[in-house]
Amino acid sequence: MAITLNGSAGITTPTYGGSVSAEYITPVTGFKNRIINGDMKIDQRNGGASVTPTSGQYPIDRWQAALTQSSKYSVQQNAGSVTPPAGFTNYLGVTSLSTYTVLTGDLFDIRQKIEGFNIPDLAWGTADAQTITLSFWVRSSLTGTFGGAIKNADATRSYPFTYTISSANTWERKTITIAGDTSGTWLTDNNAGMQVGFGLGVGSTYSGTAGEWAGFNFVSATGATSVVGTNGATFYITGVQLEKGSTATSFDYRPYSTELALCQRYYQEVTWTLRTYSVNGYLYYNYCALPVTMRAIPTATTLSTAAEALVFVSAFAPVSVNSVRSGFAASGTGDAYIWERKEALSAEL
């Protein structure tokens, strides 16, 4: 009799005596990808709308824009509405808004900061540092050598890398293997442990030799193509994966609900309503658990407010990594309420 697990023969027992043989089945591993939203399908803030970012802004979830000059590029989920590579439905699209000559101290890139809790097994900063492999799909209206970098939280260690785009307006898969850094400080707590960035135009101050670890804040490799140098140039990317080992494996597809929850650890939007029979001058509060525990106690920003009645002053504040408090002081006696106030909670790295 054969026992079959997931379509593979596992343990076979003979019908009439004899020995028992066991066949080893390679275990299925999950969460090999340290990048969150690598397939660019979550965009809580902008819902697919185009953004001309300021430095530090997140055009789509977990992906941050860094820039030293404003209004040089826009970012949009699925910009240009091209067909993504097979297996993907979304991508991050950058469009240059000018013909800009990058200055020595300029930098433009799209990056993701990886929480330290997600990289302790890499053992970077020690003699046991593990090799990693970065893989992704990229498409650009430009061809040539492009660059990026991996660095630690305080940017005292960095590894510039290059890759070549051979054909314009064609999706190409790139793979870069990087020996783990045996030096520097690589945090393994709830702060940023590692940064991965893709250059869009970087001056010489922040450009270094590709393929080498350096004790400096390099954002890209020397001589890399500048996307912001050509008006209307496009740069699209998806399927970004960073994994332990020297081999690029297939993309780590995770359920939408799982990927959304991973993003909500750093940013989420909540809508709250509070309604009660009030007495003039009294305070009314409500505590609510968040759907996902956040990385740290978040900051709150009011996005929108609908109707309210008999409210003198209202308040909303996070009280922990997994709960918030909302409330108001009543301005009269009767049916008092705040209706559908929307708040953004951010605990980004």
PLM regions with names:
Residues T4, I11-G17, A22-L349:
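Extracellular and organelle-lumenal recognition/adhesion modules and their flexible linkers in secreted
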